[in-house]
From Swiss-Prot:
Species this protein is from: Canis lupus familiaris (Dog)
Annotated family: Belongs to the G-protein coupled receptor 1 family.
Major subcellular location class: membrane
Protein name in UniProt: Adenosine receptor A2b
Lipidation, S-palmitoyl cysteine type: C310
Record function comment: Receptor for adenosine. The activity of this receptor is mediated by G proteins which activate adenylyl cyclase.
PROSITE patterns: G_PROTEIN_RECEP_F1_1 (PS00237), G_PROTEIN_RECEP_F1_2 (PS50262)
Extracellular compartment spans: 1-8, 68-78, 145-177, 259-266
Amino acid sequence: MQLETQDALYVALELAIAALSVAGNVLVCAAVGTSSALQTPTNYFLVSLAAADVAVGLFAIPFAITISLGFCTDFHSCLFLACFVLVLTQSSIFSLLAVAVDRYLAIRVPLRYKSLVTGTRARGVIAVLWVLAFGIGLTPFLGWNSKDSATNCTEPWDGTTNESCCLVKCLFENVVPMSYMVYFNFFGCVLPPLLIMLVIYIKIFMVACKQLQRTELVDHSRTVIQREIHAAKSLAMIVGIFALCWLPVHAINCVTLFQPARAKDKPKWAMNMAILLSHASSVVNPIVYAYRNRDFRYTFHKIISRYVLCQTDVLKSGNGQAGTQSALDVGL
C-alpha cells in the first residue's frame, strides 16, 4: 500500500514523537530510580505519568498510525486499539490530579504532610488510579460502541455468523461512538479533573501568597514557601500544556457529535494535527522537569554522561551531595 504524502508525513511525525516520548520519559523514570533526592511521593506520581507517556510512545502511537491507515480487521481488535489510547490518557489525567492534591496538602498542612503522604500510600493511590483508568478506557467493550452500525454481521437461519461480514475499516470513529467520547469521556472524565486541578492550583497560590505576607515568618519558612510556589508553577505549567494539547481533539469530537453535517467536511489534516498535538504532550514533561528542576537536570546529565556518552562518573543524588534535602526542596 502506497502512502499519500500527507499520510507519510503524519506517520513520520508520529514516529519522531514516539521516539522522543520513550527516550525522555524513560530518562525521568531512571532519574527517580537512581537519585535518592528525587524519591518523593510527588515524584512517584510523576513516574506514573511518565510510564503512561512511555506506553504512548511504545504502543498508543503505533496503534494510532495503524488506525489512521484504515486497514480492515475484526471489530473488537480495532476497538481494543482505540480504547488503549483512552486508558493512557485517563491515567495521565489522574496522575496530574494526584500531583495537584499532593502539592495542596504540602502547602496547606505542611506539618502533617510527611505523615499523611508517604511513599507506600502514594504507590497505593497510583495502583487505584490505573485500575480506574482501565475501567474508564475499556468501557466501550461493555457495549457502548458502534458495532451495530460499523458491521453488517447477519445471523442466518442456522445460527452461524458470516465472519467475513464482520470486518470493519479500522478507524476510530467507526468503533467508538462520539456520544461516549463527548458525554462520558470528555464531559465526565476529562473536563472535571482539569477544572478541579485549576481550582486546586489557584488555592495553592492564594494560600502561599497569604503565608508569605505574614511578617513573623522566619527566613527558612519563607524559603520553603517560595520553593512550593516554584513547584506549583511548574506543575501548573504541565497541566496547562496537557490541556492545550488535548482540547483540540475533544473540540473536534464535539463538532462531530453536535454538528455532523459540518464534521463531514472537516479536512483530514486538521484531525491529524490534533492527534499529533495530543501525542506531543508526552514529550513535553521531561523538558519541563529539566528546565525547572535542578535535581532532575543534574540527574539527567549524570545518566546521559554515564550510559549514553560512556563517561565513568559516579551517579550521586540530584544535587551532587547526599540526599538529605527535604521533600519540599526536590519538588519541581
